A protein has these predicted regions:
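Hydrophobic transmembrane alpha-helical segments in integral membrane proteins
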Residues: 1-13
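Loop-to-helix transition at the N-terminal end of transmembrane alpha-helices
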Residues: 6, 33-46
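Hydrophobic core of alpha-helical transmembrane segments in multi-pass integral membrane proteins
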Residues: 10-20, 60-61, 132
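Membrane-water interface of transmembrane alpha-helices
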Residues: 14-27, 99-109
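Membrane-interface helix-loop junction between the first two transmembrane segments
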Residues: 21-39
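Membrane-embedded catalytic scaffold of the fatty acid hydroxylase/desaturase
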Residues: 46-59, 78-234
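Membrane-interface helix termini and inter-helical loops of multi-pass transporters
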Residues: 64-77
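Cytosolic-facing loops and C-terminal tails of multi-pass membrane proteins
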Residues: 230-272
Length: 272
């Protein structure tokens, strides 16, 4: 299998596993029709894939191969052991994705596109696919720039992409973990309960828990919140501007950054 087939196989396995678990150990009650949301979020994901293919072709793994063939990037000069390079690549890119996530909340122009992700009225595994195509393009451009500068191997990028995709699905999933397990996992990775706080309508909670994979960045950089104002099953998901199902149709999501003037979600001292 090539890189894209491997990524898709991992994605599909995690997606179907989380989807199945949500029907058995659901954590948060739903307010919108799951089938309707699933169709919308999958449609957005399909559009995103087509857009990335159109503009970037082989995307991140292809960028690593391209850089390696030309000797670009730090790792291509250092010639460190492959295992060490993979570890450093995963950790470094995870930190950069965390920083990118903070930035799209702080800068109003970027928030206009990222609000599409936060406008979901419920949070489940399909929410991990809900991104505006322009945000996906910007994110991919940022990631390719990092890959050119770092020079990781294609296998390192493939491993990172697989982890990122899988953890995005896991952290957005609407599943119940035993409290003791959730508490233990949070020391290392982002759990669904931890990330659900980030999708709260409460502005202070929206501006917290930015990580997708490793939880250490939120803890180390002061953006971690352990508990929401409300108990987990009572957290109101979404943003205050869009509370009706008809406001978050596929067409409206695609046009949302251009037709609406969302509230500024940048930090202020009292909100941190």
């Amino acid at each position: 299998m090539d890189a894209n087939q491997i990524r898709f196989a991992i994605f599909l396995a995690v997606f179907l596993l989380m989807l199945g678990l949500e029907s058995i150990i659901q954590r948060h009650p739903t307010v919108d029709a799951k089938t309707r949301r699933l169709k919308i979020n999958l449609a957005l994901a399909g559009i995103d894939i087509l857009v990335v293919r159109l503009f970037f072709g082989a995307a991140a793994v292809g960028a690593a191969q391209f850089a390696g063939e030309r000797g670009w990037g730090l790792f291509n000069y250092l010639q460190w052991p492959e295992g060490l390079e993979i570890f450093l690549c995963v950790v470094f890119l995870d930190l950069m994705i965390y920083i990118q996530h903070v930035v799209v909340h702080m800068i109003p122009f970027f928030w206009r596109f990222h609000i599409v992700h936060h406008s979901d009225l419920d949070l489940d595994v399909s929410s991990g696919l809900r991104f505006h195509p322009i945000e996906i393009l910007g994110s991919m451009l940022f990631k390719i720039g990092l890959i050119f500068a770092l020079g990781p191997s294609a296998i390192a990028v493939l491993i990172f992409e697989a982890i990122l995709n899988g953890m995005a699905l896991f952290s957005h999933s609407n599943i119940t973990l035993p409290e003791s397990l959730d508490r233990l996992l949070r020391y290392v990775i982002v759990t669904p309960d931890m990330h659900r706080i980030h999708h709260s309508v409460e502005k202070r909670e929206t501006n917290s828990n930015y990580g997708f994979n490793l939880s250490i960045w939120d803890r180390a950089l002061g953006t971690y919140i352990h508990d929401a104002l409300k108990p987990q099953p009572r957290i109101i998901i979404g943003v205050s501007q869009f509370r009706a199902s008809e406001e978050v149709s596929l067409k409206n999501l695609l046009m949302m950054p251009f037709r609406e003037v969302p509230e500024n979600h940048s930090f202020s001292p009292e909100e941190k």
